[in-house]
């Protein structure tokens, strides 16, 4: 559970905006973060900011610059990286340093991919996209050749590293305080909550998606990594807490 949250337009945090009818005006407290999915996403972004503001300088010697954060409902949306729809799902655009979170993806992840309907499973998705922002800040994204595919491609390596960064957030979130309240944003996850997050990582593995959609697996076309790889690297970050 999220214990506290900052306002959606807090000046010291990531600026959250919406590109649809999603209402963030109700996001005023920890209670609303635990009640409304959109508020939990805002609070998760604030927690990610707090964790990376501490950890990126401490571990990599780099200053953390906060991304923009846009909530949308799967309808058409424009970014510096082009137009997107629900077929794309959540994504990070380095061109405008923005995390675009398609809120409709969560029901798709649960209904079509078999992921658990748990808060930490959804928060993992946000943390993964913020992981791509970390890659942009460190220069790792610019160095990678994202044109290829396959289990050992740079595209897959970037995705697995973003999973690891998501795990690093889980490791530190329950001990990183909200600068306004002094209390951590996130209570220490239970074993069941962690199981749900691991299930989400497994559900978005390329092999799992291909098996459900086509009945067979083609590793040469992978762009995100297998279920086993994604779970392993998320777990690595969660256990180590180290970049």
Language-model features: locations:
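Acidic helix-start/capping segments at beta-turn-to-alpha-helix junctions
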Residues: 28-37, 41-47, 57-80, 183-190
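Catalytic zinc-binding patch centered on the HExxH motif and its immediate surroundings
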Residues: 75-102
């Amino acid at each position: 559970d999220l214990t506290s949250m900052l306002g959606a337009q807090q000046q010291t945090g990531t600026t959250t905006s919406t590109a649809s009818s999603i209402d963030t005006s109700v996001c005023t407290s920890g209670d609303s973060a635990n009640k409304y999915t959109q508020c939990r996403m805002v609070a998760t972004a604030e927690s990610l900011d707090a964790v990376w503001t501490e950890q990126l300088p401490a571990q990599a010697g780099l200053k953390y610059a906060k991304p923009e954060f846009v909530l949308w409902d799967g309808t058409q949306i424009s970014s510096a990286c082009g137009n997107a729809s629900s077929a794309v799902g959540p994504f990070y655009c380095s061109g405008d340093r923005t995390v675009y979170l398609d809120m409709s993806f969560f029901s798709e992840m649960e209904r079509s991919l078999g992921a658990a309907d748990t808060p930490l499973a959804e928060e993992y998705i946000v943390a993964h996209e913020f992981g791509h922002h970390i890659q942009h800040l460190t220069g790792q994204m610019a160095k990678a050749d994202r044109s290829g595919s396959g289990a050992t491609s740079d595209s897959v390596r970037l995705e697995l590293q973003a999973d690891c960064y998501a795990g690093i957030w889980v490791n530190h979130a329950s001990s990183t305080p909200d600068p306004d309240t002094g209390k951590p944003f996130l209570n220490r996850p239970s074993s069941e909550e962690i199981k749900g997050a691991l299930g989400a990582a497994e559900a978005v593995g390329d092999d799992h998606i291909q098996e459900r959609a086509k009945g067979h697996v083609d590793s040469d076309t992978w762009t995100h990594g297998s279920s086993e790889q994604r779970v392993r690297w998320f777990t690595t970050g969660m256990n180590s807490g180290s970049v």
